[in-house]
């Protein structure tokens, strides 16, 4: 049996930023004159699994896709939802129907107009039967979404339609206050009608067509993803950075050293041991902000014994979350629910044992472990699969130690490169 650690993101966003260190080209205005930033070099922690917005599922891809595409709506720096390709929208009084009016100035990078049909096509692609999208569930508020993806309804019954070239209508089966936020995510991005047939369309600049502030200029896996400003972007006049480069550096210390050497302008993978020293060394450059994200362990429920609820409860109870975030040491918060704290308007359920003492929690973990049929004479044995990178290794080693110490479980650690991790995790 196997369980795996998600590598999508952590509960707290963390970065070092030194925009003044960006490469600005030749100084044509003499010494002492501040030059505009024309390029940006970012550490990305790894290569994207894909740049197909319908199939992307990792933070490495999401970082790049936000530059390559623009959704109907987008997020402002303060987290609020603001117009994107849609100039405005109306929501019916019952909260079930959204009507979006698209800007006629929105163009694809090849010059074609971005239409309501392109957005409808992207959403239908995600929810088509047999879809491999890991984030299709985010679109389940759409009318008949579950029925369509499970082949119980035809795709034309899905709650999305283009009324005309510049008007998109979306219908929900029940009100969903968060739905506008979903539409800012890659899973709801438009798809050009020439894309989607082959994977190379999303990896080769010769085929790639996007509608964002940047175009794909080069992708050398394991080396760099280079983007160039899209002159046809609807708001190109306000895009001052001409080139953005993403470097897939797996080792966080290597990435930090590149940042310190001036070879990167942003790094978001600070090694745990360096967090406090860096806050003292570069207080103006360390940025910490809440992030709508979760670091979690995914279980393979298709086979025994991980399909036994009592065993899953034992594994969860055995984790000392307070200790875990202390070991990781980058300002994360313990996660006691699926939705992180701080989400506006959300008051989620919490474990009833959240405030137990460590001894009480471990006692309940052992009780659940015994009730699941395991003990010292019959210990649980399983494999924990995790992505490369010292954060993930730290978490994996800590979890394995906790399960062994509290329950007596025997854990085999299996570290895999990110792409191989994606290909072999099912």
Predicted regions and their residues:
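Ligand/substrate-recognition segments at binding pockets and active sites
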Residues: 25, 367-426
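Short, well-ordered beta-strand elements
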Residues: 36-49, 87, 97-100, 119-122, ...
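N-terminal lobe/hinge region of extracytoplasmic solute-binding protein
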Residues: 43-93, 124, 131, 207-210
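Aromatic- and charge-enriched surface segment that lines or borders ligand/interaction sites
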Residues: 87-135, 169, 258, 305
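Alpha-helical secondary-structure segments
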Residues: 115-122, 165-171, 212-213, 241-243, ...
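Gly/Pro-rich hinge or "lid" segments in bacterial periplasmic/extracellular proteins
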Residues: 143-145, 151-156, 161, 166, ...
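Extracellular/periplasmic solute-recognition and catalytic clefts
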Residues: 217-228, 245-303, 326
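Structural transition elements
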Residues: 333-372, 389-394
């Amino acid at each position: 049996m196997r369980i795996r650690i998600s590598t999508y993101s952590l509960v707290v966003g963390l970065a070092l930023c030194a925009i003044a260190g960006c490469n600005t080209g030749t100084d044509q205005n003499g010494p002492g004159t501040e030059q505009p930033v024309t390029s940006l070099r970012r550490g990305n922690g790894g290569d994207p699994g894909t740049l197909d917005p319908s199939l992307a599922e990792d933070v490495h891809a999401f970082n790049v896709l936000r530059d390559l595409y623009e959704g109907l709506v987008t997020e402002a720096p303060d987290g609020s939802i603001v117009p994107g390709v849609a100039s405005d929208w109306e929501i019916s009084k019952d909260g079930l129907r959204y009507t979006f009016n698209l800007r006629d100035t929105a163009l694809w990078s090849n010059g074609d107009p971005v239409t309501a049909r392109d957005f409808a096509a992207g959403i239908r692609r995600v929810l088509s039967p047999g879809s491999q999208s890991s984030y299709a569930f985010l679109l389940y508020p759409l009318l008949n979404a579950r029925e369509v993806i499970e082949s119980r309804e035809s795709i034309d019954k899905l709650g999305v339609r283009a009324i005309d070239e510049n008007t998109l209508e979306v219908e929900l089966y029940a009100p969903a206050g968060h739905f506008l936020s979903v539409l800012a995510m890659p899973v709801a991005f438009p798809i050009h009608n020439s894309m989607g047939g082959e994977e190379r369309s999303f990896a080769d600049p010769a085929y790639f067509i996007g509608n964002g502030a940047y175009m794909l200029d080069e992708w050398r896996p394991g080396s760099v993803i280079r983007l160039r400003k899209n002159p046809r972007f609807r708001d190109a006049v306000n895009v001052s950075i001409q080139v953005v480069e993403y470097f897939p550096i797996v080792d966080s210390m290597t990435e930090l050293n590149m940042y310190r050497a001036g070879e990167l302008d942003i790094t978001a993978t600070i090694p745990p041991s360096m967090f406090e020293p860096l806050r003292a060394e570069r207080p103006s450059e360390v940025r910490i902000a809440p992030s709508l994200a979760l670091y979690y362990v995914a279980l393979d429920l298709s086979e025994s014994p991980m399909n036994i609820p009592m065993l899953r409860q034992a594994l969860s109870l055995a984790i000392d979350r307070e200790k875990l975030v202390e070991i990781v040491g980058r300002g994360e918060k313990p996660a006691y629910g699926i939705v992180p704290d701080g989400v506006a308007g959300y008051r989620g359920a919490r474990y009833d044992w959240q405030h137990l003492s460590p001894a009480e929690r471990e006692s309940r973990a052992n009780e659940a472990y015994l009730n699941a049929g395991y003990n010292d004479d019959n210990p649980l044995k399983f494999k924990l699969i995790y992505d490369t990178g010292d954060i993930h290794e730290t978490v994996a080693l800590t979890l394995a130690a906790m399960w062994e110490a509290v329950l007596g479980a025997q854990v085999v650690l299996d570290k895999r490169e990110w792409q191989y991790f994606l290909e072999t995790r099912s």
